[in-house]
Every structure is written in C-alpha cells, then in structure tokens.
Amino acid sequence: MMQPNAKLLSPSAKFLPSPIEPPQHNRRTTVGAPPSLERNCKLSRRNLSKSSLLLLLTTQTTLTPLLDFSKAQADTIANPNLTNCENRIPTKKAFIDVSIDGEPIGRIIIGLYGDDVPAGTARFSSIVSGKAGITYRRKDFVKIMPGYVQHGGIRSYGVDAERATAAVGSLQNLIEEWERGKRGEICNVNKAGSVGIVVRDPSKPPPKTKLVARNGKLVVEEEVIAVGPNGTEFVITAVDSPELEDSVLVIGKVLEGMGVVEKMREVKTVRDNTSSPYFRVAKVIGDKRAVVAERGFNRPYSKVVVTNCGLIESQTL
C-alpha cells in the first residue's frame, strides 16, 4: 500500500504564519498593596463616620421644628377646640381676699366663663357670693402643690353640706361639662392662671362589690370606699398643670392677683411621702392609717384662709 506523502498532506504548511505567542502578563505582586488598601479603607470608614454624624445632626436640626409643628397640628386636628381656649371671654368677675396666719396678702380677681361652662360658673358664683347660703369665706386652702393651690371647699357634714347640694345644683351637671371637655367639645385645658372646680378623684379606686342576704335573697351591693369631691373645692394653677385635666373642670382664669398665688406657694407644707416603700405597702394592703396620712400630704403648716369673697358688678370685663 502506498504511504501518503507528508508534503501532499500539508502543501501550504510553509505558507502558514507562525503561531503568535500569547502576551506575557506581568505577574509580579506588589507587597505594599494590601496595607495601602487597608489604610484607605480605614480612612474611608473614618470619613464615612464623620459624614454620617454630620448628616444626623443636620437631619435632627431640620426635622425637629417640623416634628414639633406636626405634633401641634395633630393635636389641633384631634381637638380643634384647643385653638379656642385663648379666645374665651369671661362673662363674670369674682374676687377672693386671702390671708396667711391672719395677715392679708392681697386679692385675686377671677374671670368666669359663663358661656362655655354655665353649670360650673353658676355653682362657683352661688358659693362665692353667698347666695346659696354657703360661702368660701373663712374656709381654708388645704393643699399647696408645686403647680397649683387647692381650696377645701365646703366640707362640713352638717347644714352647709345639705345647702350646698340643694342650692347650687347637682355634681352630675359639673361632671357632664367635664366629660364634654374630655371629648373636645369645650376647652378644658389647665393653663397657668386657670381656675377650676374639682369634680372627681381619679385616684379613687372603683367601689368594691359584696354579696349580702336581703329578704332571703343574695344581693350584690357596692361598698363606698371614701367620700369623693362634692363640687365645692376649687384650684388655682400657677403653671401649666395637665395632670389636673382628669379631675378639674376649668371655669375661669385669674385676671389679677397672681402675685398672691405665688405668696401662697411659698408657704411650707407637710412633706409628700408617697414614694416611701412603707407607705406603698400600707396603701396596697388597705391600711387606713395610710389613707389618713395621705390626706395630710402637702397641707400648709400656716393657716391660709379666704377672708372675703364675692362677685364684682361691672359691665366691663
């Protein structure tokens, strides 16, 4: 058999170009590259931290006024009557003269919101004028708090209490006006200089129930724990006191005499011991001594008394 000729198999081999060798890449490694990269990364992180902090501070500075404005706007939307608090016009004027340990300290003139809270204004007016047969005259301020002073009202359980209930209307009318304030239908904000009637005690626990046998049947009765406000106590605020909004119906504001309120706040009082663990335990277990002691907290050592009070007959309010 004939062997194939190599020249015939590749006749153009000599005309083919020689293969091109692939380029030789420089594979030398730089020893100093990783440290330099690490150093650059550290520098970037440091700069990033500074930039982030600056951005955070700038954002807070920019957004804080916006958040405050949004919160105020939300409060206004939730309770649109808050914007009308400053627009209320007093319809009556009343005055109370105050003394400390027999020394007169001045007169407080109060403007009453008869159009907004007619029941509360009518009750306060009847007592301050003596029209109901009872009066705040010669009655004491029983509590002096950092933000407000509180008058004890008519606390007698004799003829005065019966007259107070019969002559000035029921407490329920005041509670209904207070509930309107909670719903935002009327303004009931305890700003500095506000005057309000205490209508409820938010710290008073709900009445306990017990089973008693009556006429051969078991009947559920409520046990009265303590006597609540009777709608004759009132407070005068020296600073904004939102904590009072759960118990006080705002009926007016101080027009003159805030200096008298400040003098009353300077009177020394019985130290509030509600933070004591012993008092807390006694209160939890229902020790009556704790209840009695609590009534004495923040009471003035001096005798702070309303020496005279009444309505001011004036057409200009």
Swiss-Prot record:
Keywords: Chaperone, Chloroplast, Isomerase, Plastid, Rotamase, Thylakoid, Transit peptide. Induction: Down-regulated by sucrose treatment. Ubiquitous. Lower levels of expression in roots. It is an enzyme of class 5 (isomerase). It catalyses: [protein]-peptidylproline (omega=180) = [protein]-peptidylproline (omega=0). The keyword Translocase does not apply. GO terms for molecular function: peptidyl-prolyl cis-trans isomerase activity. It is found in: Plastid, Chloroplast thylakoid. Its EC number is 5.2.1.8. PROSITE patterns: CSA_PPIASE_2. The keyword Transcription does not apply. InterPro entries: Cyclophilin-like_dom_sf (IPR029000), Cyclophilin-type_PPIase_dom (IPR002130), CYP26-2-like (IPR044185). Residues 1-37 are annotated as: Disordered. Residues 95-311 form the PPIase cyclophilin-type domain. GO terms for cellular component: chloroplast; chloroplast thylakoid; mitochondrion. Belongs to the cyclophilin-type PPIase family. PPIases accelerate the folding of proteins. It catalyzes the cis-trans isomerization of proline imidic peptide bonds in oligopeptides. This is Peptidyl-prolyl cis-trans isomerase CYP26-2, chloroplastic. It comes from Arabidopsis thaliana (Mouse-ear cress).
